[in-house]
Amino acid sequence: MSAYCGKYKDELIKNAAYIGTPGKGILAADESTGTIGKRFASINVENVEDNRRAFRELLFCTPGALQYISGVILFDETLYQKTKDGKPFVDVLKEAGALPGIKVDKGTIEVAGTDKETTTQGHDDLGKQCAKYYEAGARFAKWRAVLKIGPNQPSQLAIDLNAQGLACYAIICQENGLVPIVEPEILVDGPHDIDRCAYVSEVVLAACYKALNEHHVLLEGTLLKPNMVTPGSDAKKVAPEVIAEYTVRTLQRTVPPAVPAIVFLSGGQSEEEATLNLNAMNKLSAKKPWSLSFSFGRALQQSTLKAWAGKTENVEKARAAFLVRCKANSEATLGTYKGDAVLGEGAAESLHVKDYKY
């Protein structure tokens, strides 16, 4: 049996290619209620639905920002929310040329018999959920698998379980019209060097693409959301050019050219750091059969959140900060970012959270 060739085939290919358009990327605004609560706590804002809606409206309705955004990942609550004037967020995004996406996983659980390694849950009723989300206007989905680097981690068991879980999710999405974003995140936590991260990334990505092929996933109708290849959070930092070289080499060795785009997660890097690293990859003269873009959450929102601080009078200032980050990352997808963006408060600070849960 060959790759998926059902009724959504052409639509999946078209939407995946569109999301990967050079000059554009993904805004990850799919934080769970608990996670956004932690972000709000940092600016002393109460975690209630109206504040969550107000912050997301601030982002989605920033004039000029969505020209740099091809897709927005939403949380279940946000997919059905409206602006204060009563316009559904899904319509706001579509009219601005950004495809709505949806987070479909249900978080991680520990794998028995391992050293606190995890697998991701959410396969039960996933087909039904995807059909419902497609009906509501979503056109792509996200599922996050999490692996750790340690003395004996990741184990082969954790690698295989997560690869199979991602592949099973991916084919269910495609059968229901959603482009699956395949996200095997290798956490940055630890003292490991960049070579160890590169090795683990290669092993994990190879396992993922083996599983995707076994599940007959249409690669042209998927996107990959990996971590950049970097030293661990407790190791000495390296230059963006080094990260670019290691990351692109890792992808060359593992990601088939049928995949239209690779959209990096920021993994707790500062806003500016994530942009500079992405820019260095796109400046690198090397074989890159896929476009290299972004799917940033914290790295697009941090300075915006700080500027807003939950106050209506700060909305314009916050939108200006958001526009700066969107434009900078758009330039980074083209390798033309000069590092000259006006840095808002928080743009240079590390956003790393140990054992990060989305």
UniProtKB/Swiss-Prot annotation:
Query: What does the record give as the reaction this protein catalyses?
Result: beta-D-fructose 1,6-bisphosphate = D-glyceraldehyde 3-phosphate + dihydroxyacetone phosphate
Organism, per UniProt?
Oryza sativa subsp. japonica
Q: Which domain of life is it from?
A: Eukaryota
Q: Where, per UniProt, does this protein localize?
A: Cytoplasm, Cytosol
A Gene Ontology biological process annotation? gluconeogenesis
Q: What is its EC number?
A: 4.1.2.13
Per the record, the similarity remark reads: Belongs to the class I fructose-bisphosphate aldolase family.
Protein's name according to its UniProt entry:
Fructose-bisphosphate aldolase 2, cytoplasmic
Which enzyme class, named as a word? lyase
Q: What does this protein do?
A: Fructose-bisphosphate aldolase that plays a key role in glycolysis and gluconeogenesis.
- Which InterPro entries does the annotation name? Aldolase_I_AS, Aldolase_TIM, FBA_I
**Keyword hit for Ribosomal protein:** no
User: Which PANTHER family does the record cross-reference, listed alphabetically?
Assistant: FRUCTOSE-BISPHOSPHATE ALDOLASE (PTHR11627)
Q: Name one GO molecular function term.
A: fructose-bisphosphate aldolase activity
Q: Give binding positions for substrate.
A: 39, 266-268, 298
Tell me the active site: 183, 225
Q: Chief localization class?
A: cytoplasm
Q: Which GO terms describe its cellular component?
A: cytosol
What pathway does this protein act in? Carbohydrate degradation; glycolysis; D-glyceraldehyde 3-phosphate and glycerone phosphate from D-glucose: step 4/4
Q: Can you state the subunit structure given in the record?
A: Homotetramer.
Q: Which Pfam families match?
A: Glycolytic
Alphabetized, the UniProt keywords read: Cytoplasm, Glycolysis, Lyase, Schiff base
Site annotation (Necessary for preference for fructose 1,6-bisphosphate over fructose 1-phosphate) points to: 358
